[in-house]
């Protein structure tokens, strides 16, 4: 049976460098373990993986200026053979009722009902923000629900589920990307706001809108 080398343990506790690093490690672990998960993050991650598989390029959690003095947050932006695709992910379950032009849709889980903003209308604003940057190329929108969601009256146009996502996407490969589409993609990416201040500002705006809805 091997003997424990207590000298190694003693060195670890007496080494000044170890005492300097230890608090940093503890803080990082604390932040990672206790940081609240953003609502819908798991669903967005699942959609992002599918998009990377079937699209030429994908950017996630994109923040752009909306052209009206504000900011807009896009779950996913993808480059396809037909142009740019703006994707809104909804990690909802239960029965979903809503039509294309309704202001709000309804989620039903058992006896509980909850109204939420029509995601097609919500994503339309995202599409317009991208079009403002690259008006010369086609920009389309798509809303993706998780497979836990059911649509008793059928999927509205422009809406799909995770398992049907591939069927809703245009066939795309590296050779099918037009140079103008690639240039438009690069232009939009160059307009993406990545600084923390912009992201914090968007969160404040989103919370105000939620309180006012």
Language-model features and meaning:
Residues 1-72, 79-84, 93, 104, ...:
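Surface-exposed interaction regions that form or flank ligand-binding interfaces
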Residues 90:
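Ligand/cofactor pocket segment of small-molecule handling proteins
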């Amino acid at each position: 049976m091997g003997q424990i080398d207590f000298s190694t343990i003693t060195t670890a506790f007496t080494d000044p460098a170890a005492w300097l690093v230890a608090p940093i490690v503890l803080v990082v672990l604390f932040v990672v373990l206790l940081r609240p998960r953003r609502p819908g993050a798991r669903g967005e991650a699942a959609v992002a993986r599918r998009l990377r598989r079937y699209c030429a390029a994908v950017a996630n959690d994109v923040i752009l200026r909306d052209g009206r003095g504000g900011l807009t947050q896009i779950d996913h932006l993808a480059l396809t053979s037909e142009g740019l695709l703006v994707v809104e992910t909804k990690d909802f379950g239960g029965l979903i009722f809503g039509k294309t032009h309704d202001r709000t849709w309804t989620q039903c889980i058992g006896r509980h009902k909850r109204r939420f903003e029509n995601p097609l209308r919500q994503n339309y604003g995202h599409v317009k923000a991208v079009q403002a940057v690259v008006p010369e190329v086609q920009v389309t929108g798509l809303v993706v629900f998780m497979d836990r969601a059911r649509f008793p009256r059928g999927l509205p146009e422009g809406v799909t589920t995770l398992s049907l996502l591939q069927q809703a996407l245009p066939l795309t490969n590296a050779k099918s990307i037009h140079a103008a589409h690639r240039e438009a993609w690069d232009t939009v990416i160059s307009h993406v706001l990545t600084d923390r201040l912009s992201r914090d500002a968007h969160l404040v705006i989103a919370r105000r809108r939620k309180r006012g809805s």
